[in-house]
Curated annotation (Swiss-Prot):
Name of this chain's protein: Tripartite motif-containing protein 75
Residues that, per the record, bind Zn(2+): 95, 98, 117, 123
Zinc finger (RING-type) in chain: 16-57
B box-type zinc finger segments: 90-131
SUPFAM superfamilies: B-box zinc-binding domain, Concanavalin A-like lectins/glucanases, RING/U-box
Family according to the record: Belongs to the TRIM/RBCC family.
Subcellular localization(s) per the UniProt record: Cytoplasm, Cytoskeleton, Spindle
B30.2/SPRY domain mapped to chain residues: 276-466
Residues in coiled coil: 168-222
Molecular function GO terms recorded: zinc ion binding
GO BP terms, alphabetized: female meiosis I
Summary of the function given for this chain in its UniProt record: May play a role in female meiosis.
SMART domains, per database record: BBOX, PRY, RING, SPRY
């Protein structure tokens, strides 16, 4: 039986790993494996960017197919040997028990039989067919199995092809993320560099301001000390005068002494901490936008009569024609409108498109701040930043001051009610502009000063922020 095993090994080598049939027009790929020419071409047709071997997964750089004529000859030889083996097997097949030709086949036991094997105690009630009928039937069964297995192999090959494509897609996505990460890191480094320079500039300005104040204090003290020394010399000279002469001058001396003993005003000198924003807020802002964005809209009842509000109450424009406002407008002096909802707890984010408006103010105010607006607005009820001309200003609960920041076309506002903070960001760069720190004692609401220009101011919805 050794020659049978050798023939089986030879036949295995002549099968195509893709279709599992004898190799047709065999070709060899660069890793050394062999396939039918049509099979490997069909397999590679599903791979756009790569060409991998279905057996070893080797990435073939070039789709070079080398015809293998020698292997084709071996296949023909193996087929001839198999035919000879089949004839020899048919001629030599006999029943080992009865030494008769095996001419029958038991369908129940799937066993070859001779005429004497068909006995009641063993196969009497079984379905027994002639070897020709059984062979014909089982060839059909085997063909069905062959179709099923080939279909399964094709499915596996398709899945492998899809996974190969997924591998390519994965690499492309990873490369895209690497590029995006590089870009984001470069932006972050530029942001940090700009923030560092701006912080150092603010620190230098503060240092120079305090140095000037110190020099002013020193000059005032020097002048005061000089005056005191002059007074002391005058005192010593007065003491040397005659009694009558001395007494005639003491009145002027006492008056002069009282004036000179008043110490000059010394201005306090304390270096304040320079405001800056570094990666913590920068990286966390996207999560803030995702989790805390509110759909803020404009409260029509609070709008100045010269403000035109859109139907969806997200856009406001200054117009010279006064509008009919239901009820009594809260703001009659300034082109202001408030937003809804009001907030008395929680964290909230909203974004406002300001475009290139030359003047505007955005922030929050106490929900009842507008009640006294007709008389005199209370600056302590507001927390807002103002753009005017070419710079930002802080206006409200903190002392008014100018911010060194580039112009932004959109402003993000983040309110943390319990923490007592309202922060402003230049969008879409997510550049921190300013943070108010205070204690809120009642409801607050969004505040919008439009300015007397025709350019609109627009609120972004929660779905399109950043807008």
């Amino acid at each position: 039986m050794a020659h049978v095993e050798v023939l089986a090994r030879l036949q295995k080598e002549t099968k195509c790993p893709i279709c599992l049939d004898d190799l047709t027009d065999p070709v060899t790929v660069e890793c050394g494996h062999n396939f039918c020419r049509s099979c490997i071409k069909d397999f590679w047709a599903g791979q756009q960017a790569t060409s991998s071997c279905p057996v070893c997964r080797h990435q073939c750089q070039h789709r070079n197919l080398r015809s293998n004529a020698q292997l084709g000859n071996m296949i023909e030889t193996a087929q001839l040997l198999q035919g000879m083996e089949n004839k020899r097997h048919e001629s030599s097949t006999s029943c080992e028990r009865h030494n008769q030709a095996l001419t029958l086949f038991c369908e129940d036991d799937l066993q070859l039989l001779c005429d004497q094997c068909v006995e009641p105690e063993s196969h009497g009630r079984h379905q027994v067919l002639s070897i020709t009928e059984a062979a014909s039937l089982h060839r059909k069964h085997l063909q069905d199995y062959s179709k099923l297995l080939k279909w399964e192999v094709k499915e596996i090959q398709g899945l492998m092809s899809a996974l190969n494509k997924r591998t390519v897609t994965l690499r492309e996505q990873a490369e895209a993320q690497r590029s995006q990460l590089t870009s984001e890191c470069e932006k972050l480094m530029r942001f940090l560099d700009q923030e560092e320079r701006a912080a150092f500039s603010r620190l230098e300005d503060e240092e120079m301001r305090l140095e000037k104040r110190l020099l002013d204090n020193i000059a005032a003290l020097e002048h005061h000390g000089s005056s005191l020394r002059d007074l002391l010399r005058h005192l010593m000279l007065t003491g040397e005068l005659s009694e009558a002469k001395m007494l005639s001058t003491v009145k002027d001396f006492y008056l002069n002494c009282r004036r000179q003993l008043i110490s000059p005003s010394i201005f306090p000198v304390q270096l304040r901490r320079v405001e800056y924003s570094f990666p913590l807020q920068y990286s966390a802002l996207q999560k803030v936008i995702q989790h805390f964005t509110d759909n803020v809209t404009l409260d029509l009842k609070t709008a100045h009569p010269n403000l035109l509000i859109s139907k969806d109450r997200t856009c406001v424009t200054f117009t010279k024609k006064r509008q009919r406002i239901p009820g009594s407008s809260s703001f009659t002096k300034s082109p202001v409108v408030l937003g809804i909802p009001h907030f008395n707890s929680g964290r909230h984010f909203w974004e406002v498109q300001v475009g290139k408006k030359p003047k505007w103010a955005i922030g929050i105010c106490k929900a009842d701040s507008s009640i006294g607006e007709r008389q005199s607005p209370n600056p302590w009820g507001y927390w807002r930043i103002v753009w005017q001309g070419d710079s930002f200003n802080v206006s409200g609960a903190d002392p008014d001051s100018r911010l060194k920041a580039a112009r932004a076309t959109s402003i993000g506002v983040f309110l943390d009610y319990e923490l007592g903070e309202v922060s402003f960001y230049g969008m879409p760069e997510k550049c921190h502009l300013y943070t108010f720190r205070d204690t809120f004692s009642g409801p607050v609401c969004p505040y919008f000063y439009i300015g007397p220009q025709s350019e609109p101011l627009r609120l972004c919805s929660a779905t399109d922020s950043e807008c």
